[in-house]
C-alpha cells in the first residue's frame, strides 16, 4: 500500500490571489452562457402602443417582419403581367360605404377599367379590393402610389395574383355558358385522354337526338354496326367489351306505359339448353291484365273455367244432339218450380239484423201519447164538474162569496156572544153585499179610540128584558176590541167555517 500523500498547507489569502490571477473557472469549461438578444430598433416617431397614429407610423409588413430573429421569409414581389388583365391588389382600405368611389377617384388619372371592393354578406366592405387597368404602364404607376394616404389610412398596392389553375383542365360543364343544353355533353371516351377502364382510346359514340327524349315517346337510334376487330376475350387493358343485342327496353316505343315490359322470347340461352323447346307456361294474372294503374284489382281469367268445363265433358265419336224442350201452357202453373225455389238468403251486413232508428217517427209517437193523456185528464175533469153540479154543489165563484159571508156571520155571532146577546140562526140566502154599508152604519168610537158595540136589527127585536139591562161602561175598563179581532182574523186568513173555532180565535185576541 502506497503511503498517503500529505496536502500542502497554504494561507487563505494566497489561495484567493492565485484563483484571481489564473482567470479560468471550472464552470467555463462545462457550461455555455446564453447570449443576449439583438436590440430592437426604435421607431423614429417616438409613439407608444395605444397612442393615436401608432399603427400608421409602423413600417410595412415586410420590413417589420425582417426586424426580429426567426421572422418568416419576406414575400416576393410578383412580376408584372405581360398580357391583360392588368389587375392591382389594394389593401388597408377604410370600411366606409363610399370607399369604392374614393378608390376610383384616386386612380382616375390612370383610366382604370374597373374597381371592385370585396364585401361581406351584409354588404359591408372588408378593407381590400382590386383595380384593373388597360395597360401595363397604368399598373406600374398604380404600384408607385403604394404607401399613400387614402381616407386617413396608408394603402398598399401590389400586383394581384393570377387565379389558381388546377392540374386538370376545366370540364365542359365549367366552360359552358348556357346550362340548358340542347345536346348531350361529350362522352369521356371521345376525349383525347385514355380511358381508365379500358386503358386505351376508344371509338366515339354515335350522336343521338336527345330532344326527342323530352316528349312522351322515346325514339331509339338505329343499332350501330359491330365494331371491327372485336375479340371474345375482353379482359386486360386495350380490350373492349363485346357488344350486346338491344334489349326490351331499347326497342320499347312507349315509355309512359304502366304495364311492365314483356320479356323477349328468343333471348340467349345457355349452351346446355340449346335446341330444347321452352316449356309452355299458362299466362298469369299479371300477363292478362291490361290496366296497371294503382288501386285496380286483378281479375280472374275466364278462359280457364271454360277450358276446364270443356275438358270435363266426355268426348264421344257420335255428334251430340240437342235436348228436346218440353213446353207447357202459360196458364198452368209450375208447382215443382215453386216448391223447389228456396228463399234467397239475406245479405250479411256488419250490423246484422239491426235497422236504423227513425227519430222523427218516435218523436211523433211521443207527441201523440202526450196529447192522448192530456185529453183523458181534461175529460176526467169535466166529468167531475158535472158530478158536482148534479149533487147541488155551488160553482167556484159562489163558493168564494159564501166563504166571505160565512166569515162575517161568524164575527157577528162572536160579538153577540161576548155582549151576552142570543145568537140568531144564520140566513140561508147568500149575501149580496148587505154587509158593506155606508159610513152611517159603521161602529162609533169612544174617547180612547175603541169602537163601540151597537145592537143589530135582529137583536133589537128581542124582548124587553134585554133592553132593561144596564149597559157596560167600556170607557172605564176596555178589555176587548171587535175591530182588532176582525183585523186579526182577516190577516190570518181564517178559512174555518165552524162557529166555535171562530169564537175561540176572537177570545184569544188581547189589547
Curated annotation (Swiss-Prot):
Residues 86-162 form the RRM domain. Its main location: cytoplasm. Residues 331-349, 420-434 have a biased composition (Low complexity). It holds the Pfam family RRM_1. GO terms for cellular component: nucleolus; P-body. The modification Phosphoserine is found at residue 334. This is Probable eukaryotic translation initiation factor 4H. It comes from Cryptococcus neoformans var. grubii serotype A (strain H99 / ATCC 208821 / CBS 10515 / FGSC 9487). The gene is TIF3.
Amino acid at each position: 500500500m502506497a503511503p498517503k500523500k500529505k496536502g500542502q498547507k497554504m494561507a487563505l489569502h494566497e489561495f484567493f490571489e492565485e484563483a484571481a490571477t489564473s482567470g479560468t473557472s471550472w464552470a467555463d469549461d462545462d457550461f455555455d452562457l446564453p447570449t443576449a438578444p439583438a436590440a430592437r430598433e426604435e421607431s423614429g416617431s417616438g409613439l407608444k402602443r395605444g397612442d393615436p397614429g401608432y399603427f400608421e407610423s409602423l413600417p410595412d409588413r415586410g420590413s417589420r417582419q425582417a426586424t426580429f430573429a426567426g421572422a418568416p421569409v419576406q414575400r416576393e414581389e410578383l412580376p408584372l403581367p405581360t398580357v391583360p388583365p392588368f389587375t392591382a391588389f389594394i389593401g388597408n382600405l377604410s370600411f366606409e360605404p363610399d370607399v369604392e368611389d374614393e378608390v376610383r377617384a384616386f386612380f382616375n388619372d390612370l383610366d382604370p377599367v374597373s374597381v371592385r371592393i370585396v364585401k361581406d354578406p351584409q354588404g359591408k366592405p372588408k378593407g381590400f379590393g382590386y383595380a384593373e387597368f388597360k395597360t401595363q404602364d397604368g399598373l406600374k404607376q398604380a404600384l408607385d402610389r403604394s404607401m399613400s394616404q387614402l381616407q386617413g389610412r396608408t394603402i398598399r398596392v401590389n400586383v394581384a395574383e393570377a387565379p389558381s389553375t388546377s392540374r386538370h383542365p376545366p370540364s365542359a360543364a365549367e366552360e359552358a355558358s348556357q346550362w340548358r343544353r340542347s345536346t348531350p355533353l361529350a362522352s369521356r371516351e371521345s376525349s383525347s385522354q385514355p380511358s381508365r377502364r379500358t386503358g386505351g382510346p376508344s371509338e366515339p359514340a354515335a350522336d343521338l337526338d336527345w330532344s326527342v327524349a323530352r316528349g312522351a315517346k322515346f325514339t331509339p337510334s338505329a343499332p350501330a354496326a359491330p365494331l371491327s376487330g372485336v375479340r371474345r376475350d375482353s379482359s386486360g387493358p386495350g380490350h373492349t367489351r363485346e357488344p350486346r343485342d338491344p334489349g326490351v327496353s331499347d326497342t320499347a316505343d312507349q315509355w309512359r306505359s304502366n304495364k311492365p315490359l314483356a320479356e323477349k322470347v328468343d333471348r340467349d340461352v345457355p349452351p346446355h339448353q340449346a335446341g330444347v323447346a321452352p316449356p309452355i307456361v299458362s299466362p298469369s294474372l299479371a300477363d292478362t291484365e291490361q290496366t296497371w294503374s294503382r288501386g285496380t284489382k286483378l281479375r280472374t281469367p275466364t278462359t280457364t273455367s271454360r277450358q276446364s268445363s270443356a275438358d270435363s265433358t266426355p268426348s264421344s265419336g257420335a255428334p251430340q244432339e240437342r235436348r228436346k224442350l218440353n213446353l207447357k201452357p202459360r196458364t198452368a202453373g209450375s208447382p215443382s218450380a215453386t216448391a223447389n225455389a228456396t228463399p234467397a238468403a239475406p245479405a250479411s251486413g256488419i250490423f246484422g239484423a239491426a235497422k236504423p232508428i227513425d227519430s222523427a217517427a218516435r218523436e211523433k209517437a211521443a207527441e201523440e201519447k202526450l196529447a192522448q193523456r192530456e185529453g183523458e185528464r181534461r175529460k176526467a175533469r169535466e166529468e167531475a164538474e158535472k158530478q158536482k153540479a148534479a149533487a147541488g154543489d155551488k160553482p167556484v165563484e159562489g163558493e168564494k162569496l159564501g166563504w166571505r159571508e160565512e166569515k162575517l156571520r161568524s164575527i157577528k155571532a162572536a160579538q153577540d156572544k161576548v155582549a151576552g146577546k142570543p145568537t140568531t140562526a144564520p140566513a140561508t140566502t147568500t149575501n149580496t153585499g148587505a154587509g158593506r154599508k155606508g159610513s152611517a152604519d159603521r161602529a162609533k168610537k169612544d174617547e180612547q179610540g175603541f169602537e163601540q158595540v151597537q145592537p143589530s136589527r135582529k137583536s133589537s127585536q128581542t124582548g124587553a128584558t134585554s133592553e132593561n139591562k144596564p149597559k157596560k161602561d167600556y170607557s172605564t175598563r176596555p178589555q176587548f176590541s171587535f175591530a182588532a179581532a176582525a183585523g186579526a182574523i182577516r190577516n190570518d186568513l181564517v178559512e174555518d167555517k165552524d162557529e166555535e173555532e171562530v169564537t175561540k180565535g176572537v177570545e184569544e185576541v188581547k189589547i
